[in-house]
A protein has these predicted regions:
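Short linear motifs embedded in intrinsically disordered, charge-biased segments
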Residues: 1-205
Length: 205
């Protein structure tokens, strides 16, 4: 079997370091192509902004965030995704330099969550779906698996597991408690909404 540094699986790029940079870059490229192909939609005088944003969400943003629930996100990757989204939204609203608009007002006018919050929401929706699966499910076992042994010295890499565990610490829940809550879909949605609201308010401080 050939040893490769990265490969594509189910539309996502997997690299040997477990990072998501290559996949995020590819997703932005595909989303940009999708956005440019719909240029006539964005320039249309007959379509309302609301309809344009809905088309953006289903035809561009869906391409951009495909598989985002399992991304190993960093401040840099989040920023790249957000910059692309903001650029698209400004073009849809026909806002060009020297005209300016704050990000918060831009998101409010287009009914958007920040990229960070959107990805966190998708991630925890996926976690809830996974925790409702059979205990024999490999995906569920991998998600809740607790690796043993000592880690290497130095600053630990920012992995998907550490990102999830940081959110768990914020909510003050362990896997056993989350597995119980996940069985109640309404309760799970409330938990995810509360987490996103908490992180949003902290970001504004």
């Amino acid at each position: 079997m050939e040893n490769v540094e990265s490969f594509t699986y189910l539309g996502s790029i997997i690299d040997e370091q477990g990072g998501s940079d290559a996949d995020v870059k590819a997703r932005i490229g595909k989303a940009r192509t999708a956005f440019l192909q719909l240029k006539n939609i964005w320039n249309s005088k007959q379509l309302s902004t609301n309809i344009k944003v809905r088309i953006f969400n289903t035809n561009v943003k869906a391409v951009l965030l495909y598989g985002a629930e399992t991304w190993r996100t960093t401040t840099t990757t989040i920023k790249k995704v957000q910059v692309f989204i903001n650029s698209c939204l400004r073009k849809i609203l026909n806002i060009h330099r020297p005209d300016t608009i704050s990000n918060s007002l831009l998101w409010e006018r287009t009914n958007q969550l920040s990229a960070e919050e959107e990805i966190r929401k998708r991630r925890w929706k996926w976690i809830g779906h996974t925790l409702r699966k059979s205990s024999n499910c490999i995906t569920r076992q991998a998600l809740t698996w607790n690796p043993e042994g000592k880690r290497k010295r130095g600053r630990p890499k920012n992995t998907l597991r550490r990102i999830i565990e940081a959110d768990m610490k914020t909510m003050n829940y362990n896997w056993t408690e989350l597995e119980r809550i996940a069985q109640d879909r309404v309760g799970w949605r409330m938990l995810v909404s509360g987490l996103c609201s908490f992180t949003r308010s902290n970001r504004r401080k």
